[in-house]
Amino acid sequence: MNTIQGIQMIGTQRSGSNLLRVMLDGIREIVAPHPPHILQRFLPLLPKYGDLADRSNFYRLAQDVCELVTVNPVPWEGIAIRTDEVVASCRQQTLYELFRVIYESAARQAGASFWLCKSMKNMLYAEGIESTGIRPYY
């Protein structure tokens, strides 16, 4: 498996999208963990991290994002998100790149060809998501 494809689910509250996410997660080729809402939670906080071109600032952000995934109320079972590995896999020092690497890592660890994120607010961040090279199915 060389290519991992993203799927960004666009749902609304009380629409049944979480049930669909759980059903899709049951397909071996798709990993669809409960969303920790990485972009929604961290984009407003980015100014607190300073210049992300500074490796230490980016690493601190990566640690916090990885911790968010780790303490997500619904665990990502069988998936280990390690800050050092995530940072080493990043091609850019951006929050969007952390998002990409974390979801692709989850897919690799699950042996899946697709990852699915059901974070509803991500539709507002499509341009940033796609700036990493991700061309998700919506």
Enumerate the predicted regions with their spans.
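Pre-Walker A (Motif I) flank of P-loop NTPase domains
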Residues: 3-6
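Hydrophobic anchor at the beta1->P-loop junction of P-loop NTPases
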Residues: 9
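Short, aromatic/basic-rich helix-turn unit that serves as a nucleic-acid recognition element
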Residues: 12
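ATP-binding Walker
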Residues: 15
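PAPS-dependent sulfation machinery
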Residues: 33-117, 121-123
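Conserved phosphate-donor/acceptor-positioning beta-strand/loop module used by diverse small-molecule
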Residues: 118-121, 125-138
